[in-house]
Structures are given as C-alpha cells and as structure tokens.
C-alpha cells in the first residue's frame, strides 16, 4: 500500500523497540495512518508524527501534524521522567467521519477531521488519571480506553475506561494487566488484549504470558486465549473470529511477528 514512512528504534538497552506507523483506520474506502516514530525527539530531524492519507498510487499525503499540536497543547500532568515531545501514537479509530487517536506518553485522546486537518482534544487523560499510559481505543456506542500502566509490570493494575463523546471518563472494568487492545463482538462482549501478565520488566520471563480476556456485559471476566507473547493489537474479523498481532515486540530474535486467529468460544 505505502512504504518509506519514518520509523525509529530504541537502543538495545531498551529492547530495540521499533516505532513506525502506530495504527491505521478507514473512513469509508479511504485508508489513513498515524505515525508513532517520527520527529526530532525520535532522532528523525525534519519529520513530525502525522496523520496521513494513503493515496491510490501508494503515495501518502499529510492530513494533520500531531507533533505540532501536542507541543502547543500540553496536557495537565505529563511525566517529566518519561516524556516524549513528539509523542508515540498508538491507536486510532474512525467514528462518523472523524479520526480519534491515542497518545500514551502524554496521556490524551485527540480528534482529527480528515477533511480539514483540524485537531482538537477529546480528553486529557492525565488530568484525572495521572500517567497511566492509555493505549487501546475502541468504539462501541461510546469509546472504551485501555491502559498499559508503568514498568515494572504490576499484575491487575490496568483497566478499561468508558469515554463518552463529551470527554467524560468512567471506570468500566479493572484488575487487568498491560492492556494493548480492546474489541467488541456482536453480543456486546468486550475482548481485552493483555500483552504481559507476569510481574517485572519485559523480557524472556514474559514470553507466553499474553492473553485475551472476555468481559461480559455484567462485568464477568473470562480468559479465552493464552500463551501469547508480547501481542500488540486485536480486532474482530468479518468471520467473527479475533485476530491478534503476536510478537509485535520483544521477541527473542527479529522477524517472528505474526497474526494469529482465535475462534471465540460460545
């Protein structure tokens, strides 16, 4: 579809984590992406993290400059010890013609109008929640926002918040760990992707600890799939199955990333 987009990599001491395109979303038949690894603070002078449109010939067109927006619209409670000026954008969804993107490092959800490039803040998560590292965004009548949390991993410290269109946050479900994805099925059941569920820092000890938790409308949680390693995203396909990007980071050797299909149990 498109290549040659900016990407960056952390040092080996931090795990050689690569940031490129953080997420994609469709408005009708038009594909959009959000960059996560661009900007001077990622080591790429002369670039910015943007929302871009993918053209039919494989080229891309900038729609909105997210780096510029967050530098001029600071959140209430940034974490000075863990601050990324350009942000590291993670999730993006399309709702009624607009795009909504999550920035975990600052802690915010922003609305982008793909027709005009206008950016506005839906919610400053840091203002009420502090530095919880929001990552996963899904829309199911309202927005639902999951968080990664801080390292070292503390089991049960993550949650999913309900976010209404006016920007108000309410706790939806808790006692989760390192949430990196949220999806819904046709029965109003939520599926939460936990990337790691062992205490400590990302490393060999976390291999195989990723899992998918189903949250029923009554709040009951059930693990429906386990044995995943550093999964990074989840979606439901047209066949009703879950699709998870497994080994999205942190694998023992490069090139092990895969998409796995999970049949939803009745």
Which residues make up each language-model segment?
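Beta-propeller fold detector
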Residues: 1-6, 58-69, 120-126, 170-174, ...
